[in-house]
């Protein structure tokens, strides 16, 4: 009988974690209009792939995974890896969700130097 409260609490935790991760899932547009990215579940994390770029000379970027292994920190943020297709380098990545806005960061030197990109939800 004491097992039921534990199972109920665990079920709520799993549901809440899944719902929280789903909040960032969807299509996002860079505020500067340069690209769109789709955030979707991949395994036990979130990943983001480029779905559109404004620059007609860069169609090869479409389909590239630019965020991966983004695991929820439980507070509307995710930590993982970010890939910059412009320089081909991988960075420590972070996503911060605030309603219909998303900020992504790529950092080096343990987070001392970061570059941020602002996104808005488009679906």
List the model feature ranges, each with a label.
Residues 92-114:
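Short, exposed beta-strand-loop hairpins at the edges of beta-sheets
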Residues 24-93:
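Central antiparallel beta-sheet cores of small beta-barrel/beta-sandwich binding domains
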Residues 21-23, 76, 98-100:
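A short, compositionally biased
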Residues 15-21:
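Sec/Tat signal peptide C-region and signal peptidase I cleavage site
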Residues 7-15:
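Bacterial N-terminal signal peptides
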Residues 1-5:
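Positively charged n-region of N-terminal signal peptides that target proteins for export
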Residues 122-123:
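Short, solvent-exposed mixed-charge patches
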